[in-house]
Amino acid sequence: MRITLADIAKKAGVSTAAVSQVLNNHAHAKALRPETRAKILQAVIESGYSRNEAAAEIRTGLSKTIALLLEFSHSAVRGAAANEILLGLLNATAQHGYNVRICNLSNLELVQQELVKYNIRYAACFAFSPLLQEEIGNFCKARDIALCYIEDSCRNDFPLVYSDDQAATREIVRKLFAEGHRRIAVVKPEDDIRYSVERCNGVAAGLQEFGLKLNPLWISAHHDPVEHFADLESWFHLPEEERPTAFICFDDNRAAQVLITALRFGIRIPDSCRIFGFGNTLARQLYYPVGTVVQAFEKMGEAVLDILTGKTENKTAPARYLFPSEIKDAQPKPDSETTSGKTCGI
């Protein structure tokens, strides 16, 4: 039999109004004596009462449900980084009493129907298709739904949360330049996703600080990571004074590919070749020292709730909330040939 507020009130010996005030954290509940509130909460526990959130939302017109719109077909949404971001979001919603409704963007029309049907006022979009991003933005804007994009967005009229990747890659270039590296190669996906563009812009900006340009011949861009091996082998076949001495990879998997290829060619790591990945998803597990960028994935997910509910103003650019990253540097050994007093790649 379903437990009602009246049942709890009878068990606790108080009015139904008092029970409602305590369960809803109403301001009037503070006027109740501590022992009365404790008695009500104990009655709730003993009765096994479960609040009907859907009914409460209909009655009050206030929805505490966040729609999590996911492009499941994209590999990045199923990756390790995405898992940490979503974990942060789920932890935040659980702590603040919000429900989460998972929506698969493979059927956009059905998702839109559900947003209307359940009167959802908050939505977080984790998608990489510009078409999906645009359609979702238009729909939420027309219905006054608070929307936050995660990691990528083609729009500037809704907030985006991610890390400051351009600043991170620029700092890596500075580190490599200080060690004497001049021939710096980039290993990246062949796409125009925002974070790929930002990371590439960061490398270019870092080189520009020292009067250098990103050499297009030292960019390996492929959708399939396996296709990088051909580029890497051609570079490592070059004479030592001509080949790249440092690699900035846009994820740790690609950094591992550079490491594997370099070791096959008998190149000492990190003495003769410096490698940086991104994301800290794999570099920490590698036996050989490979640098990486540690991103605050869980904090990004937690921030989504605050952004949607208007509890934060910590944005670094219009509608962009970018978290600083930590560069985890696998420093060369003391006996390394690549030291601050010797220039590599000249």
Locations of regions flagged by a protein language model:
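N-terminal helix-turn-helix DNA-binding module of bacterial transcription factors
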Residues: 1-62, 340-345
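Residue-level detector of anion-binding/catalytic polar loops
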Residues: 15, 50, 94-99, 146, ...
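Short beta-strand segments enriched in small/hydrophobic residues
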Residues: 18-20, 58-76, 183-190
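Alpha-helical structural signal in soluble globular domains
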Residues: 43, 88-92, 139, 198-210, ...
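Alpha-helical recognition/docking segments in bacterial nutrient-uptake
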Residues: 61-174, 234-241, 253, 312
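Hinge/beta->alpha junction and helix N-cap segments in small-molecule ligand-binding domains
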Residues: 72-84, 102-110, 161-171, 187-233, ...
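Flexible loop/turn connectors
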Residues: 229-346
